[in-house]
């Protein structure tokens, strides 16, 4: 899956899954726009990794929750690279995956739901609104949105987080239906628990062990495991796929 001369925008790319995705695209020859919010040093390290892997990259600080900031980021990418071929919406509101400390439904305020909606759907909305005029003009483009296997099997009911990710699936499929005739594809990748990441740092070892025992492939995903399916959905290998959700959880979703 070569991405030579392709330009890829990855949001939330300074660490974890986003960083792994950025590195993977660069290793296939892509130019990667490494979006981040606060950690400039981490973003710079990802840029260096991308260049060492054989691609090109630069970091752009932008809050995907701000339509103005996102528009400026997309305009900068187009000014510097002349094009955008792929968008990966990976950024989301900070969340702690701790089954023993999660809030029950009666303890979850609507504001908690709204915060996750704003992060998951709002961020993707802003990025898509900013990049779609360019995609329409070129009559091509691929959008990959990162969701969660919890939308299919909420083994732990993280009410606000999972509901927002489910909404992102609906958002993606509606876009896929509307944009397909224009040559623009929209798909989702749904990882299970990914370790190590900042979000999974709160997940206790005993729960991780129980998850491993329930997973047919008998381990937990690493950030690099998520990158491959993202590249597949962004590539010509998946040119006849849109509106799909690929589950990347070692088969756990079957149980």
Which residues are covered by each model-predicted region?
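Conserved glycine-rich cofactor-binding loop
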Residues: 7, 14-15
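Conserved glycine-rich Rossmann-like NAD(P)H-binding loop of the short-chain dehydrogenase/reductase
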Residues: 28-45
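Catalytic Tyr-X3-Lys loop
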Residues: 85, 106-125, 140, 144, ...
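Substrate-binding pocket helix/loop in short-chain dehydrogenase/reductase
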Residues: 97-117, 200, 211
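Active-site loop-to-helix junction immediately N-terminal to the catalytic Tyr of the SDR YXXXK motif
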Residues: 100-101, 154-163, 174
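Active-site helix of classical SDR
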Residues: 128, 164, 172
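Alpha-helical segment proximal to the catalytic Tyr-Lys
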Residues: 133, 177-178, 239
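Short, small/polar-rich loop/turn modules that mediate ligand/substrate recognition or access, typified
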Residues: 180, 185, 241-243, 249
């Amino acid at each position: 899956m070569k991405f030579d001369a392709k330009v890829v925008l990855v949001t939330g790319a300074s660490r974890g899954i986003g960083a792994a995705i950025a590195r993977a695209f660069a290793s296939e020859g892509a130019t990667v726009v490494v979006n981040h919010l606060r950690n400039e040093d981490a973003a710079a390290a990802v840029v260096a990794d991308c260049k060492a892997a054989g691609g090109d990259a630069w970091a752009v600080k932008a809050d995907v929750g701000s339509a103005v900031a996102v528009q400026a980021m997309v305009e900068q990418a187009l000014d510097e690279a002349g094009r955008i071929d792929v968008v990966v919406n990976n950024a989301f509101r900070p969340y702690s995956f701790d089954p023993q400390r999660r809030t029950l439904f009666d303890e979850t305020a609507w504001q908690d739901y709204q915060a996750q909606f704003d992060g998951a759907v709002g961020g993707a909305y802003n990025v898509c609104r900013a990049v779609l005029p360019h995609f329409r003009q070129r009559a091509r483009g691929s959008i990959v949105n990162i969701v969660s296997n919890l939308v299919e099997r909420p083994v732990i009911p993280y009410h606000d987080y999972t509901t927002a990710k489910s909404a992102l699936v609906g958002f993606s499929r509606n876009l896929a239906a509307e944009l397909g005739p224009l040559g623009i594809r929209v798909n989702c990748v749904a990882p299970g628990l990914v370790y190590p990441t900042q979000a999974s740092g709160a997940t206790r070892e005993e729960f991780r062990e129980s998850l491993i025992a329930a997973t047919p492939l008998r381990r937990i995903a690493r950030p690099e495991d998520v990158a491959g399916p993202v590249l597949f959905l962004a590539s010509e290998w998946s040119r006849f796929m849109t509106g799909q959700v690929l589950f990347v959880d070692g088969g756990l979703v079957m149980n």
